[in-house]
């Protein structure tokens, strides 16, 4: 893994910082594990914008990543590491002993030729997936399930991890990167180690066009709009003289957005204040 700063041969290259991984596969992805991915432009079935700042971008295929890791007792060999345009983490193509191939999230330190396994009898090493009742307290894990059999939902992006800090009967307590402490059923699965490609956060796109390649459109400030377009719009100069709100008048900056009170009992401690 190398961090490359581009030479300023043009204004668009001047600030570019790339993360280069020579171990990534340079050919095409494994076709049977690809799916068509169509663009929505942020519109719903009525043609109305439901998510702003989305549009354009390079064509992509969706890689079918195995988040469940439920092929127990069958060892697999890592064939290669690949780039995935749909996520910040890299993925690994693994070949199981019975001939099946699957994509998994590539944990830190995983390389071609390594062996991985899932199940209660899997060894305690990076890349193996076990129920959390079988993982030692203090271990660092990723791709953590929140319901048994549903597939990993927590800690899936580049460099992410969760720490198992306690085990109490049928529940384990996890410490998330945000500082939140949360209880999850001990039968939920997790993959040992942390997600690879942690250097992803160090990259610098360098120009607006690089965001457009990724399907991200510009974000216009409300205070730069007219009163008809945004509550912050209009006026002389840059002041808007009121509490910050969204384009629809809902208070922002500090307003609580969590509404799922049913699962509040599983949150032992709220995330840390910044």
Swiss-Prot record:
GO cellular component terms, A-Z: cytosolic large ribosomal subunit
Record region (Disordered): 221-274
GO biological process: cytoplasmic translation
Keywords: Ribonucleoprotein, Ribosomal protein, RNA-binding, rRNA-binding
MF-aspect GO terms: RNA binding; rRNA binding; structural constituent of ribosome; transferase activity
Any Pfam family: Ribosomal_L2_C
Protein's job: One of the primary rRNA binding proteins. Required for association of the 30S and 50S subunits to form the 70S ribosome, for tRNA binding and peptide bond formation. It has been suggested to have peptidyltransferase activity; this is somewhat controversial. Makes several contacts with the 16S rRNA in the 70S ribosome.
UniProt record similarity statement: Belongs to the universal ribosomal protein uL2 family.
HAMAP family associated with the record: Ribosomal_uL2_B (MF_01320_B)
UniProt protein name: Large ribosomal subunit protein uL2
Organism: Yersinia pestis
């Amino acid at each position: 893994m190398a961090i490359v700063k581009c030479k300023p041969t043009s204004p668009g290259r001047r600030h570019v910082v790339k993360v280069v991984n020579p171990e990534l596969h340079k050919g095409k992805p494994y076709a049977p594990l690809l799916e068509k991915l169509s663009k929505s432009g942020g519109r719903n079935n009525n043609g109305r914008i439901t998510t702003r700042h989305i549009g354009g971008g390079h064509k992509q295929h969706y890689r079918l990543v195995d988040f469940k890791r439920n092929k127990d007792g069958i060892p697999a060999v890592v064939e290669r590491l690949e780039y995935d345009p749909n996520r910040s983490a890299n993925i690994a193509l693994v070949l199981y002993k019975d001939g099946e191939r699957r994509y998994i999230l590539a944990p830190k330190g995983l390389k071609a030729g390594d062996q991985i396994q899932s199940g209660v009898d899997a060894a305690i090493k990076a890349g193996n997936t076990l129920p959390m009742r079988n993982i030692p307290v203090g271990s660092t894990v990723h791709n953590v399930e929140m319901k048994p059999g549903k597939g990993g939902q927590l800690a899936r992006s580049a460099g992410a991890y969760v720490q198992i800090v306690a085990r109490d009967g049928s529940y384990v307590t996890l410490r998330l990167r945000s500082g939140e402490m949360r209880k999850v059923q001990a039968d939920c699965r997790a993959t040992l180690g942390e997600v690879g490609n942690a250097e992803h956060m160090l990259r610098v796109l360098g120009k607006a066009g690089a965001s457009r390649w990724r399907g991200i459109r510009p974000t216009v400030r409300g205070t730069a709009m007219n009163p008809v377009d945004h509550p912050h719009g209009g006026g002389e100069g840059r002041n808007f003289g009121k509490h910050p709100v969204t384009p629809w008048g809902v208070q922002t900056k500090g307003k609580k957005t969590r509404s799922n009170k049913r699962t509040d009992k599983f949150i032992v401690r709220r995330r840390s204040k910044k």
